[in-house]
Amino acid sequence: MVNTLSDVNNTDNYGAGQIQVLEGLEAVRKRPGMYIGSTSERGLHHLVWEIVDNSIDEALAGYASHIEVVIEKDNWIKVTDNGRGIPVDIQEKMGRPAVEVILTVLHAGGKFGGGGYKVSGGLHGVGSSVVNALSQDLEVYVHRNGTIYHQAYKQGVPQFDLKEIGDTDKTGTAIRFKADKEIFTETTVYNYETLQKRIRELAFLNKGIQITLKDEREEEVREDSYHYEGGIKSYVDLLNENKEPLHDEPIYIHQSKDDIEVEIALQYNSGYATNLLTYANNIHTYEGGTHEDGFKRALTRVLNSYGTQSKIIKEDKDRLSGEDTREGLTAVVSIKHGDPQFEGQTKTKLGNSEVRQVVDRLFSEHFERFLYENPSVGRIIVEKGIMASRARVAAKKAREVTRRKSALDVSSLPGKLADCSSKNPEESEIFLVEGDSAGGSTKSGRDSRTQAILPLRGKILNVEKARLDRILNNNEIRQMITAFGTGIGGEFDISKARYHKIVIMTDADVDGAHIRTLLLTFFYRFMRPLIEAGYVYIAQPPLYKLTQGKQKYYVFNDRELDKLKQELNPSPKWSIARYKGLGEMNADQLWETTMNPEHRSMLQVRLEDAIDADQTFEMLMGDVVENRRQFIEDNAVYANLDF
């Protein structure tokens, strides 16, 4: 702990007077989901982020440079920073030490008065007190004023008054807590990779801060430390690592206006997909918002203006749409705001209207100057946009074919689609089934009220290597777009989704895995909001059927099969049938094993790490063979090959 703490420095009048109290903490244990989203694995990890966010705030204020997160034995978490240390003097309104108020009163903290912190990262803004309320045990150690202060809590209740336990020449705060099993009934075990990915993201978004993660649960301690002086510029470098950049360095801007801090990094590559990540106060704004709007608006306007004045765009027909200017773009937009307003289904859309104009103005001034100072790069970017524009015009006719006016519009549906009778998207499912024969079985075995079937013939186009015009000329892709009802590209609208479960159902062999990967690549590159909303699933058809007398067992993998063999009596003799494809199962078997909501097992496709997802699709489906070969060699030991 001591290593992460800072030598005594100026605490800048950060004291109890800056800690404001808004309301009590009684409801937190009764309704934890209101405060941390859920009590699932995701909610468990959210506890860590609430504490880490406070340390990030201290770093953004200029008082901390190192944050350490440790998963201790028995899944205790310890978060230490080398900031000023939480104030320990008496908070006037409550008559208790400020650190105790922060840890026991909801919405008490330096972020609410405006005088303590300029920016607060926490999505819910509830912080330490909620973590305390939802922890079986929590301990705080404050190094401040040359003294170490300590207090312990159980389920949010102080066990003794704040006490002095020693002298120190450091400053900082360490909080240890253990999540309460009464609240987190699903699991209290932390996933190292989940913590690692978010910590790496936070290090990119807060340049210069070092964040270390340690796992002490096993004998061999695992440790990763992240520190990026380049910040989001380094982020873009990593995202484009497996791509072919069109210019050497990412274009970078970091400026403030009207107390809004704007940081943008972008670089074009030779590909066709757009990878635009936006953040507000370190929160990934999956649904976009005003900062994204301002960036897109400025990008389109500046490129058209520059292209026209430089005589690269010579005709009106070559004017660029927003979609054209973003082809092959990798960009990260990050803003910091003293009072962010979040909206949208998942509270991940920035709503502050003033941000749009600030981002637009700061970015357009910088970007325009860059283009005129680097005309060769400007020409490459504009010419790429013109090519995209011509491809878009070529795709227009094909796009019209995919339009479905509404969920009730059946006249435009693909002929092969066996639609469901329900018009309620929340209960409707569509199964994308490999092959016509399997499609026939699934049509016979489904619940026709809520389950639609769309058979796919053969492998769809690899969209990683294709422009939108070519993609829209692919029959299987066109049928999917029409069936889903959302549109594609710039016209994509998730509110028009006809089904809230889109289920990929392929054979359990290598071809099936390839088709599954092609479909996931398409969803990730052109319909990513479907994944982000949790609408995309992978069916789990059985690989084996084991029969013993009149008893049948369906088994989904080799490990389950081995376990079942050991558990069953050798008599009566049993037989094993291996399903090579969905077409080998009759309608009743498909319903019983794979489609019946009462018994089926499905995997929900989730996007937790934009960097890993982007690099994985680029590696598996892109042009660089060497990277793919290396991946196969590294992972061959885990593969279940089917010859």
Swiss-Prot record:
GO MF entries: ATP binding; DNA binding; DNA negative supercoiling activity; metal ion binding
Residues given in the record as Mg(2+) 2 binding sites: 507, 509
Record text on cofactor binding: Binds two Mg(2+) per subunit. The magnesium ions form salt bridges with both the protein and the DNA. Can also accept other divalent metal cations, such as Mn(2+) or Ca(2+).
Catalytic reaction annotation: ATP-dependent breakage, passage and rejoining of double-stranded DNA
Pfam family, one: DNA_gyraseB
EC number of this enzyme: 5.6.2.2
Annotated PROSITE patterns: TOPOISOMERASE_II, TOPRIM
GO BP of this protein: DNA topological change; DNA-templated DNA replication
InterPro entries the UniProt entry points to: DNA_gyrase_B_C, GyrB, HATPase_C_sf, Ribosomal_Su5_D2-typ_SF, Ribsml_uS5_D2-typ_fold_subgr, Topo_IIA, Topo_IIA-like_dom_sf, Topo_IIA_B
Cofactors: Mg(2+); Mn(2+); Ca(2+)
Positions bearing the site annotation: Interaction with DNA: 459, 462
Keyword DNA-binding applies: yes
Keyword Repressor applies: no
Binding site for Mg(2+) 1: 434, 507
Subunit architecture: Heterotetramer, composed of two GyrA and two GyrB chains. In the heterotetramer, GyrA contains the active site tyrosine that forms a transient covalent intermediate with DNA, while GyrB binds cofactors and catalyzes ATP hydrolysis.
Its job: A type II topoisomerase that negatively supercoils closed circular double-stranded (ds) DNA in an ATP-dependent manner to modulate DNA topology and maintain chromosomes in an underwound state. Negative supercoiling favors strand separation, and DNA replication, transcription, recombination and repair, all of which involve strand separation. Also able to catalyze the interconversion of other topological isomers of dsDNA rings, including catenanes and knotted rings. Type II topoisomerases break and join 2 DNA strands simultaneously in an ATP-dependent manner.
Additional information: Few gyrases are as efficient as E.coli at forming negative supercoils. Not all organisms have 2 type II topoisomerases; in organisms with a single type II topoisomerase this enzyme also has to decatenate newly replicated chromosomes.
Protein name per the record: DNA gyrase subunit B
Gene source species: Staphylococcus epidermidis (strain ATCC 35984 / DSM 28319 / BCRC 17069 / CCUG 31568 / BM 3577 / RP62A)
